[in-house]
């Protein structure tokens, strides 16, 4: 480790393989906490490179529990979090809309870090039991079209750095990893980011991974398509700034997106969207995010307008709600 630290202090970059070796060494307790703290601090001060991020990703996946799913093409929809907007569970709701439209979804998530209710909170609130049993996971994917992968069951490396991250109290490379360590390694992903720097970083990451992707950012700082103003979308096929009106949506008010003050209130909004009784702004935001997810799955062969209509039909027909009920039945 000492050699790596000296190189970082000299503003050198570490290779993908070196970073993977370091991560595996951390899980084997090869380094004292002081050296790990120094490593994380050096990386944060200089800025993490794509290869350094991918090296830690490789190490987390290698030391974790894999989830080998029996499907060729499925998507994960996730936001980076940390935008401090306390929105309702937009990405998670969009996942069930996408699955209701007949596509496969492998949602990877965790408990809330900066909001009232994260993906795991709202899923668990409905009585779901998290599992890493691959047979149960594949049954859920095949019969409900969607599977939920609770991060803490799979990324075993994270427990080795938990106390250090808590003590540092500033973001580290680990804050950038949660969105690219889905143990099922989906070939499609829709990622919401809170700023354009993150968009550039993950655009390079996904290009190196060779997957189909969409990255979205609302210009006013939401890590998803909020419809509160202009938003930018970057995919394998195009890069464009949209206005809500371009897609036939009214501009949303920030207060219409708030996820409530309690986990119960967040779950009620989640339910109301799937039951097609949500505020128009809440439904529209889910339709927009689900629509861009569907476009990723379709490799950009369908227009975004077509994909949003597919998502709308999933809600209006009750298919999204039926999908969620089947998911609950299989996973409770």
Please tell me what each predicted stretch does:
Residues 9, 77-80, 87, 107, ...:
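Short glycine/serine/threonine-biased micro-segments
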Residues 38, 93-97, 285, 289-292:
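Short amphipathic alpha-helical face segments that pack within enzyme cores
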Residues 43, 109, 192-195:
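Short loop or secondary-structure boundary microenvironments that flank
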Residues 17, 34, 51, 135, ...:
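Residues in well-ordered alpha-helical elements
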Residues 1-87, 101, 105, 252-257, ...:
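Acidic, glycine/proline-rich low-complexity segments that act as flexible tails and inter-domain linkers
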Residues 71-77, 95, 99, 183-188:
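Long, low-complexity, intrinsically disordered polar/charged segments
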Residues 79, 83-140:
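A generic, well-ordered mixed alpha/beta core segment in the N-terminal half of proteins
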């Amino acid at each position: 480790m000492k050699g790596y630290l000296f190189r970082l202090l000299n503003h050198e970059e570490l290779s993908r393989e070196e970073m993977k070796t370091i991560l595996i060494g951390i899980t084997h307790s090869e380094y004292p906490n002081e050296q790990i703290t120094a490593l994380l601090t050096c990386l944060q001060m200089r800025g993490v490179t794509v290869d350094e991020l991918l090296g830690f990703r490789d190490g987390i996946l290698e030391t974790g529990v894999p989830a080998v799913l029996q499907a060729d093409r499925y998507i994960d929809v996730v936001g980076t979090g940390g935008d401090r907007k306390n929105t309702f569970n937009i990405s998670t709701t969009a996942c069930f809309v996408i699955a209701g439209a007949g596509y496969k979804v492998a949602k990877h998530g965790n408990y809330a870090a900066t909001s009232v209710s994260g993906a795991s909170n709202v899923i668990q609130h409905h009585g779901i039991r998290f599992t890493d049993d691959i047979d149960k996971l594949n049954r859920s994917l095949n019969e409900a079209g969607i599977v939920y992968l609770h991060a803490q069951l799979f990324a075993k490396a994270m427990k080795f750095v938990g106390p250090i991250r808590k003590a540092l109290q500033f973001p580290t490379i680990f804050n950038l990893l949660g969105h690219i360590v889905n143990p099922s390694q989906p070939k499609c992903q829709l990622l919401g980011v809170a700023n354009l720097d993150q968009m550039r970083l993950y655009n390079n990451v996904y290009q190196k991974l060779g997957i189909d992707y969409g990255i979205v950012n609302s210009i006013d700082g939401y890590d998803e398509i909020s419809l509160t103003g202009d938003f930018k979308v970057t995919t394998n096929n195009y890069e464009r700034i949209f206005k809500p009106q371009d897609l036939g949506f009214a501009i949303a008010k920030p207060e219409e997106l708030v996820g409530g003050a309690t986990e119960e209130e967040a779950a009620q909004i989640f339910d109301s969207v799937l039951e097609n009784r949500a505020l128009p702004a809440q439904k529209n935001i889910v339709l927009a995010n689900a629509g861009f997810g569907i476009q990723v799955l379709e490799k950009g062969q369908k227009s975004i307008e077509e994909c949003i209509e597919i998502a709308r039909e999933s809600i209006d027909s009750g298919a999204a709600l039926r999908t969620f009920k089947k998911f609950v039945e299989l996973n409770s």
